[in-house]
From Swiss-Prot:
Catalyzes the reversible reaction in which hydroxymethyl group from 5,10-methylenetetrahydrofolate is transferred onto alpha-ketoisovalerate to form ketopantoate. This is 3-methyl-2-oxobutanoate hydroxymethyltransferase. It comes from Staphylococcus aureus (strain NCTC 8325 / PS 47). SUPFAM superfamilies: Phosphoenolpyruvate/pyruvate domain. Its cofactor is Mg(2+). Binds 1 Mg(2+) ion per subunit.
Length: 272
């Protein structure tokens, strides 16, 4: 399992870091078997596995439930679990209680929290021993305000993102996710931080990349963002399901190959 120190060492050696989301035991098991460096249990599970329209409906209980399953599936991978909307920003005491509950009950290596406004939370969480990954740029929990669009696209916005990135690092963040920002801006931020910067829709100048499992494998998704490359096609599973339906209806399944050979009814009838 990678440690924070090893991830920083990868950055220093310019070894790219791979990160993929996982939301359950089998997907986590696959991601670990593939040798991916980090797993993100993202609140995107709201759309990908729970069928919500956004991350807004995702609860702390949801994140704990799925985080536990992922840890069981990937016991030897660095796992980061999202703080869902409402888990940060109520009061510092409640925020830290939520963070501690999520961190302890999922056995994660770190938690992730969105936005530039959470630097005081990062400081406090770090002080009590909870590693925090920050998330800037497009933050899905705020799409109701900012929308799904490129962030940092003006001079002022870019300068603010650079400042925000420095602030979350100074607050103690162990890594930073940058989403949907210009490539050159992401590269500039990555160069000026000592912590690993993981990009999603931020070009190749970051220290690593993260993609959503269901997006990159075309597994039950209707829309994919511009920055998503499809690496496999899990949608072919529908063809298998259709064939199963046909074979059940025709009586072709189960054939002898898939049937136990033991005969018991002669013995039952002989006892009558």
């Amino acid at each position: 399992m990678k440690t924070v120190s090893q991830l920083i060492d990868m950055k220093q050696k310019q070894t790219k870091i791979s990160m993929v989301t996982a939301y359950d035991f089998p997907s986590a098991k696959q991601v670990e078997a593939a040798g991916i460096d980090m797993i993100l249990v993202g609140d995107s599970l709201g759309m990908t596995v729970l069928g919500y329209e956004s991350t807004v409906q995702v609860t702390l209980a949801d994140m704990i439930h799925h985080g536990r399953a992922v840890r069981r599936g990937a016991p030897n991978t660095f796992v980061v679990v999202d703080m869902p909307i409402g888990a940060v920003g109520i009061s510092m005491t409640q925020d830290l209680n939520h963070a501690l509950k999520l961190y302890q009950e999922t056995n994660a290596n770190a938690i992730k929290a969105e936005g530039a406004h959470i630097t005081p939370f990062i400081e406090k969480a770090t002080a009590i021993g909870i590693p925090v990954v920050a998330h800037l740029g497009l933050t899905p929990q705020s799409v109701g305000v900012m929308g799904y669009k490129l962030q940092g696209a003006t001079k002022e916005a870019a300068e603010q993102l650079i400042l925000d990135a420095k602030n979350v690092e100074q607050a103690g963040a162990v890594a930073l996710v940058l989403e949907a920002i210009p490539n050159d801006l992401a590269e500039e931020i990555s160069k000026h931080l000592t912590i690993p910067v993981i990009g999603i829709g931020a070009g190749k100048g970051t220290d690593g990349q993260v993609l959503v499992y269901h997006d990159m494998l075309n597994y039950g998704v209707e829309h994919k963002a511009k920055f998503v490359k499809q690496f496999a096609d899990f949608s072919v599973g529908v063809d298998g399901l259709k064939q199963y339906d046909q074979e059940v209806k025709s009586g072709a399944f189960p054939s002898e190959e898939y049937t136990y050979k033991k005969k018991i009814m002669n013995e039952v009838n002989n006892n009558d």
